[in-house]
Amino acid sequence: MDLIAQIEAEQIAALGKDIPDFRAGDTVRVGFKVTEGTRTRVQNYEGVCIARNNGHGIAGSFTVRKISFGEGVERVFPLHSTNIESITVVRRGRVRRAKLYYLRSRRGKSARIAENTNYKPKSGASV
Protein backbone atom coordinates (compact mmCIF):
# COMPACT_ATOMS: atom_id res chain seq x y z
CA MET A 1 0.00 0.00 0.00
CA ASP A 2 1.48 3.34 -0.99
CA LEU A 3 1.72 6.30 1.37
CA ILE A 4 -1.33 8.20 0.08
CA ALA A 5 -3.59 5.15 0.28
CA GLN A 6 -2.31 4.46 3.79
CA ILE A 7 -3.08 8.03 4.95
CA GLU A 8 -6.55 7.84 3.37
CA ALA A 9 -7.24 4.54 5.15
CA GLU A 10 -6.19 6.10 8.48
CA GLN A 11 -8.49 9.10 7.93
CA ILE A 12 -11.45 6.87 7.03
CA ALA A 13 -10.81 4.71 10.11
CA ALA A 14 -10.62 7.84 12.30
CA LEU A 15 -14.07 8.93 11.09
CA GLY A 16 -15.52 5.61 12.26
CA LYS A 17 -18.53 5.75 9.93
CA ASP A 18 -20.38 2.61 8.92
CA ILE A 19 -21.24 3.09 5.24
CA PRO A 20 -23.49 0.43 3.72
CA ASP A 21 -22.71 -1.29 0.45
CA PHE A 22 -24.83 0.51 -2.16
CA ARG A 23 -24.45 1.37 -5.81
CA ALA A 24 -26.20 3.13 -8.68
CA GLY A 25 -29.84 2.09 -8.95
CA ASP A 26 -30.36 1.61 -5.22
CA THR A 27 -32.89 3.76 -3.39
CA VAL A 28 -31.16 5.32 -0.39
CA ARG A 29 -32.23 7.50 2.52
CA VAL A 30 -29.54 9.97 3.61
CA GLY A 31 -29.84 11.64 7.01
CA PHE A 32 -28.13 15.00 6.50
CA LYS A 33 -27.46 17.55 9.26
CA VAL A 34 -28.94 20.95 8.39
CA THR A 35 -28.11 24.07 10.41
CA GLU A 36 -30.86 26.68 10.58
CA GLY A 37 -29.73 29.63 12.62
CA THR A 38 -28.47 28.22 15.90
CA ARG A 39 -30.21 24.86 15.86
CA THR A 40 -29.22 21.75 13.95
CA ARG A 41 -31.61 19.08 12.77
CA VAL A 42 -31.42 15.96 10.62
CA GLN A 43 -33.15 16.13 7.25
CA ASN A 44 -33.83 12.87 5.42
CA TYR A 45 -33.26 12.90 1.67
CA GLU A 46 -34.60 9.80 -0.08
CA GLY A 47 -34.07 9.03 -3.74
CA VAL A 48 -32.33 6.89 -6.32
CA CYS A 49 -28.54 6.84 -6.33
CA ILE A 50 -27.67 7.65 -9.94
CA ALA A 51 -23.86 7.77 -9.59
CA ARG A 52 -20.96 6.87 -7.32
CA ASN A 53 -17.77 8.87 -7.88
CA ASN A 54 -14.22 8.10 -6.69
CA GLY A 55 -15.17 4.77 -5.15
CA HIS A 56 -14.83 4.27 -1.42
CA GLY A 57 -11.87 6.64 -0.86
CA ILE A 58 -11.91 9.74 1.32
CA ALA A 59 -12.85 11.87 -1.71
CA GLY A 60 -15.74 9.60 -2.72
CA SER A 61 -19.18 11.02 -3.39
CA PHE A 62 -22.57 9.89 -4.64
CA THR A 63 -25.47 11.59 -6.41
CA VAL A 64 -29.07 11.05 -5.29
CA ARG A 65 -32.05 12.02 -7.47
CA LYS A 66 -35.63 12.38 -6.31
CA ILE A 67 -38.82 13.92 -7.67
CA SER A 68 -40.10 16.70 -5.43
CA PHE A 69 -43.42 18.37 -6.31
CA GLY A 70 -43.08 17.25 -9.94
CA GLU A 71 -39.51 18.56 -10.33
CA GLY A 72 -36.40 16.41 -10.45
CA VAL A 73 -33.93 17.33 -7.71
CA GLU A 74 -30.38 15.99 -7.54
CA ARG A 75 -27.97 16.35 -4.69
CA VAL A 76 -24.33 15.30 -4.46
CA PHE A 77 -23.20 14.03 -1.06
CA PRO A 78 -19.56 13.48 -0.04
CA LEU A 79 -19.36 9.87 1.14
CA HIS A 80 -17.37 10.56 4.31
CA SER A 81 -18.87 13.95 5.20
CA THR A 82 -19.27 14.77 8.89
CA ASN A 83 -22.68 16.26 8.04
CA ILE A 84 -24.06 12.87 7.01
CA GLU A 85 -25.60 11.19 10.02
CA SER A 86 -26.83 8.01 8.34
CA ILE A 87 -27.13 6.26 5.00
CA THR A 88 -29.83 3.60 4.73
CA VAL A 89 -30.50 1.40 1.71
CA VAL A 90 -34.28 1.30 1.26
CA ARG A 91 -34.42 -0.81 -1.89
CA ARG A 92 -31.93 -2.54 -4.20
CA GLY A 93 -32.29 -1.71 -7.88
CA ARG A 94 -31.37 -3.88 -10.85
CA VAL A 95 -29.54 -1.77 -13.44
CA ARG A 96 -26.88 -2.46 -16.04
CA ARG A 97 -25.05 0.85 -15.91
CA ALA A 98 -22.74 2.53 -13.41
CA LYS A 99 -24.09 6.02 -14.15
CA LEU A 100 -27.84 6.50 -14.55
CA TYR A 101 -27.83 10.00 -16.03
CA TYR A 102 -30.37 8.88 -18.64
CA LEU A 103 -33.03 8.99 -15.90
CA ARG A 104 -32.91 12.80 -16.10
CA SER A 105 -34.80 12.76 -19.39
CA ARG A 106 -37.34 10.13 -18.28
CA ARG A 107 -40.70 10.76 -16.62
CA GLY A 108 -43.22 8.52 -14.90
CA LYS A 109 -43.16 4.78 -15.50
CA SER A 110 -40.16 4.86 -17.83
CA ALA A 111 -38.04 6.26 -14.98
CA ARG A 112 -38.79 3.27 -12.72
CA ILE A 113 -36.05 0.84 -11.75
CA ALA A 114 -36.76 -2.86 -11.25
CA GLU A 115 -36.03 -4.23 -7.80
CA ASN A 116 -33.15 -6.65 -7.37
CA THR A 117 -34.54 -9.51 -5.29
CA ASN A 118 -31.43 -11.69 -5.67
CA TYR A 119 -28.97 -9.29 -4.04
CA LYS A 120 -25.96 -10.89 -2.40
CA PRO A 121 -23.51 -8.60 -0.55
CA LYS A 122 -19.83 -8.81 -1.38
CA SER A 123 -17.78 -10.69 1.17
CA GLY A 124 -16.69 -8.35 3.97
CA ALA A 125 -19.25 -5.67 3.10
CA SER A 126 -21.69 -4.37 5.67
CA VAL A 127 -25.37 -4.40 4.75
UniProtKB/Swiss-Prot annotation:
Organism listed in the record: Roseobacter denitrificans (strain ATCC 33942 / OCh 114) (Erythrobacter sp. (strain OCh 114))
Gene Ontology, cellular component aspect: cytosolic large ribosomal subunit
Alphabetical keyword list: Ribonucleoprotein, Ribosomal protein
Gene3D superfamilies with a match to the protein in the record: 2.30.30.790
Coiled coil feature spans: none
One BP term from GO: translation
PANTHER family: LARGE RIBOSOMAL SUBUNIT PROTEIN BL19M (PTHR15680:SF9), RIBOSOMAL PROTEIN L19 (PTHR15680)
The protein's name in its UniProt record: Large ribosomal subunit protein bL19
One Gene Ontology term of the molecular function aspect: structural constituent of ribosome
Cited InterPro entries: Ribosomal_bL19, Ribosomal_bL19_CS, Ribosomal_bL19_sf, Translation_prot_SH3-like_sf
UniProt-listed PROSITE patterns: RIBOSOMAL_L19 (PS01015)
Ribonucleoprotein found in the keyword field: yes
Family that this chain belongs to: Belongs to the bacterial ribosomal protein bL19 family.
Function: This protein is located at the 30S-50S ribosomal subunit interface and may play a role in the structure and function of the aminoacyl-tRNA binding site.
Organism lineage: Bacteria, Pseudomonadati, Pseudomonadota, Alphaproteobacteria, Rhodobacterales
A UniProt-annotated Pfam family: Ribosomal_L19
